[in-house]
Amino acid sequence: MDENKQKALAAALGQIEKQFGKGSIMRLGDNRAMDVETISTGSLSLDIALGAGGLPMGRIVEIFGPESSGKTTLTLELIAAAQREGKTCAFIDAEHALDPVYAKKLGVNIDELLVSQPDTGEQALEICDALARSGAVDVIVVDSVAALTPKAEIEGEMGDSHMGLQARMLSQAMRKLTGNLKQSNCMCIFINQIRMKIGVMFGNPETTTGGNALKFYASVRLDIRRTGAIKEGEEVVGNETRIKVVKNKIAAPFKEANTQIMYGQGFNREGELIDLGVKHKMVEKSGAWYSYNGDKIGQGKANACKYLKENPEIAKTLDKKLREMLLNPENMQLIAETSSAADDVEFGAVPEEF
């Protein structure tokens, strides 16, 4: 670029920054925050599938799936992880179904959690926008999009037609929210439900509620499904769960995480550590015995999980080593080359009898 153009560009940039504030325009390479800040989801295998170690701050995230698949559990696990880092979280409970006892069991500090149970969809989204603009809230969860009922529909008669009303309301909210969330570095998670499209002969008949705007504005979309039951004798104690990253703007999409959600406990973190540790040769398995750093930690997976639960420092060290290995781009190619030779281990394998 010649000298005159450089001067003109510098003057234009200076004028823009003077009018709209510092940071309103910059060269892409000058942005110090190119590495997106993330918060752990509470599941190691999901953090790895996301490719960045968690869900991104300052972005919109959509989590959808069938009923009782673990959508709210996933968000409560993330809130607990965020609170442990000293972050402020809010839960907009449009379904009026948040269970504080269950939230507390998952590690959520309910005394510090901000909760709103709005009357209308517009009120819920206005509260969400106000919290984002405040700059004091780090994580907002909206449960759920399907329950964001427009005021006109609530005040109208049963059977009245309100074509596209909710979709228009959400589309306007997305336009307002996106910039505010980015400026305040606040993550907004929308939980969504699944509906069936009528008359679809070929392809997937499933769709999510609230129109298409949320699909476009979301940086990450997670599809969570229950794939089986975990039994202790005859009693069902948890669910096998598969989480697919169907959209990802911060890393490669379409990866899957298989995990377990135990009733009243949340993610089976110790089970994930054992499975990933064995897969990547950090935990040795000889017959039914599991060993870590040469020391036997249990006979059978259930006992190995129990050992890690009783020794949180060892579990924390193993978690840190696995994250450093699996989230380091330099190691990803090596892992991809050796994974075909290694024995595949299902993250969500059914644990042996407790």
Swiss-Prot record:
One GO CC annotation: cytoplasm
Binding positions for ATP per the UniProt entry: G65, P66, E67, S68, S69, G70, K71, T72
Subcellular localization: Cytoplasm
UniProt xrefs under PROSITE patterns: RECA_1, RECA_2, RECA_3
GO molecular function: ATP binding; ATP hydrolysis activity; ATP-dependent DNA damage sensor activity; damaged DNA binding; single-stranded DNA binding
Entry keyword set: ATP-binding, Cytoplasm, DNA damage, DNA recombination, DNA repair, DNA-binding, Nucleotide-binding, SOS response
Membrane-spanning ranges: none
CDD domains per UniProt: RecA (cd00983)
GO biological process, alphabetically ordered: DNA recombination; DNA repair; SOS response
Annotated function: Can catalyze the hydrolysis of ATP in the presence of single-stranded DNA, the ATP-dependent uptake of single-stranded DNA by duplex DNA, and the ATP-dependent hybridization of homologous single-stranded DNAs. It interacts with LexA causing its activation and leading to its autocatalytic cleavage.
PANTHER family assigned to the protein according to its UniProt record, in alphabetical order: MITOCHONDRIAL DNA REPAIR PROTEIN RECA HOMOLOG-RELATED (PTHR45900:SF1), RECA (PTHR45900)
Protein family according to the UniProt entry: Belongs to the RecA family.
Protein name per the record: Protein RecA
Organism: Vibrio cholerae serotype O1 (strain ATCC 39315 / El Tor Inaba N16961)
Phylogenetic lineage: Bacteria, Pseudomonadati, Pseudomonadota, Gammaproteobacteria, Vibrionales
